[in-house]
Structures are given as C-alpha cells and as structure tokens.
Amino acid sequence: MRKTRLTFIAALACIMMLGCTHQPQTTIEKIDCLKKQVVVDADALQTIANQDFVKLQKDFHYCDSLLQYLDAKVVEASFEHLNLTQAYLLQFKEVKPVMEKKMDYVVEQLGNLKSDAESHYLSDSLVLVYLDTETKVADTLHAQVEYFKDSFSKCQASLDQLKKSKK
C-alpha cells in the first residue's frame, strides 16, 4: 500500500514537472515565431524601401512632369492621386527609420526574453506578460508594413494609369 502511494506520488510529481517544463517550451516557440515574424517584416520593409518606394518616387516625379502636357480634365482628375502619392512617400520617409529602430529593439528584446525564459530568470507568468507586450508592438509594426505595401500598390496603379493617358 505504501509502495503504491509512493509510486503514485512520484508519477504525479513527474507529470507536474513535465507540465511545468512544457509551458516554457511553448512560450519559447512563441518567442521564436514572433522573432521570425519581425525579421520577415523587417525584410519586407527593406524591400518596400529599395524597390517599391524607389519606383513609386521615380514614377511620381515623371507623372508630375507630365501634367503640363495633359488635358485639363486629366490633370484635375490626377492631381488628387498625385497629392496622395506624395503624402505616402513623405510619410514613409519619416516613419521608416522609426520602424527599423522598433524592429531592431523588438528582436533584441525577444532574444533577451528567450534567454530569460530558458534560464528561468523570469517566472512563466512574467515571461507571458513581456511576450504579450512585444506581440502588440510586433503586430503594430506588421500592420504598418502591410499598410505601406497596400498604399504603394494602389498609388502605383494610379500612376500607371496616368502614364498610359500620356501615350
């Protein structure tokens, strides 16, 4: 009877320990996944800056120079699109460095958080609190990247239409 009770207690302790060690592993996987998301978003931001932004800016200047040669109705219809494109370009120039710094900081914080979680320096609940905070920042950054992708795509389509009207 006593041996059975000890075996049961030992088995219960093992199950509890496995349950405790499983949670940080899941948390570590979440940290790694979030870190990968931020790195992918940082790469996407660089692609936007190096390709989409450059092309959009070039096409914007080209279309702006076309206005003097176009019909007044086309100019009037295009003017709003050109102003909107210019606003997105200026916004991107201002926001991009801030986004890059935030992305670098989040990646660094997630690396520190993973280290602290693996070494049990922080409690599981505190790790989850920090992870939630970093997740909110990462989600905001992701939304900003998607916003610029979408905005630049729409602006590019508008400029392409204007370029066609010249031909």
Predicted regions and their residues:
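Extracytoplasmic electrostatic interaction patches
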Residues: A87-K167
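Low-complexity, intrinsically disordered/propeptide-like segments
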Residues: I9-A11, I15, Q37, I48, ...
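Sec-dependent bacterial lipoprotein signal peptides
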Residues: M1-C20
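Structured domain cores in non-transmembrane regions
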Residues: Q57-K102
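Immediate post-signal-peptide N-terminus of mature secreted/exported proteins
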Residues: C20-E76
